[in-house]
Amino acid sequence: MISPTQFHNSVHNAISGYWGIAAGAMTPSSVVSAHDGSFAAGLLEAVMLLGSEQRPVLLIACDSDYPQPLHDARPVPDTFAVALLLTTMPHPGKTIAQLSFCGDTLFTDAEVQPMDDHALETLRQSIPAARCLPLLQLIARGEAGRVVLDYVNPPRLAVDVAPCS
């Protein structure tokens, strides 16, 4: 028999639930899991919420080593997390990039471009939440361009990035 005390932290929405309780948060939260496409799936859901709710959305993607038997199916060698605050209106001096999602080019069969840095590419491939690294790299460089993110192979998610001044 499985004890509830052994099970309660194994569900993927436990983090969101605990944070909501501790912070007294009354706003909705959504938890998405899509294997290696989880970051892109979360980003897509966050953008849809942003459009429908017309209020800021905090996207948090995180992974840590999975317990058995999940570890055998998808080993995660380290912990990784990223948070993006998405808004519909830029905030001068605070907004660092504009992300665009175009309907006809939102999904693509184009390949994900590997990271130039071998260590970052290894991290990107080995941890689902780290699939955000190409997007973060483009934002950090202050460059405009298109990033292709792992989603469901295929298609992949295409995101256009423009720096804000």
Question: What does each model-identified segment do?
Answer:
Residues 2-6, 12, 16-29, 61-165:
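Conserved "HGTGT" condensation-loop signature of ketosynthase/thiolase-family condensing enzymes
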Residues 10, 36-40, 126:
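Short, conserved micro-motifs enriched in small and acidic residues
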Residues 32-57:
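Active-site-proximal alpha-helical scaffold in enzymes
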